[in-house]
Amino acid sequence: MLDANTLAKGCALQPDDVYCLPLPRAAGVEGYYYARSMPTSLQLAQAAELFDAHPLVGVLGPALPLYAGCAAEKARRWQQQKPAVQAKLSALVCPLPLDETPPPLPNGGCLLVRGAAFPQGLPPLQTESDFWLVPLLAQYNGYASATFETAAQCAARADVLDAALAAQRGVGPVFRLMGRTVKNALRKRKESAR
């Protein structure tokens, strides 16, 4: 685990190592959830296995919690901090276009990074907006970002998905969906015949 002082200065990383970057601790309830999302020793071992099995994964972090408003809050923060992130990317000569959708990470607690994903090393990471750079720089260097969930999060996600799909289980929605599928297939066949 790299400490805050090392992260504040920026640092070179060994290509064969995996590093744990703790995010700045938030206050209040958010700080509680950030602390809860720190990986356990079992999760760290599983992350090392994942990095070994998937050589193009450069950044791994906890999934966004399924609490009401988490996704909206993340999107709001991204919009607020996006200009600063774009300026830092420009200063690092990293021409990545940014859109309205926030990167998949960071979501809290920490980020696990593969040293090889950062051949130029890590830039100074002091503020919350600095940590948006980590998955973006990995992407620029050809590496993907991935999230991990606990067993409880995975079960909760299945429950939420099941509830969302329940409305589509009636006869009416199924026939509407079938009708759209047939209509689109006929339209494509008609266009290809021209």
Question: Locations of the language-model features?
Answer:
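ER/Golgi luminal nucleotide-sugar-dependent glycosyltransferases, focusing on the catalytic module
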Residues: 1-194
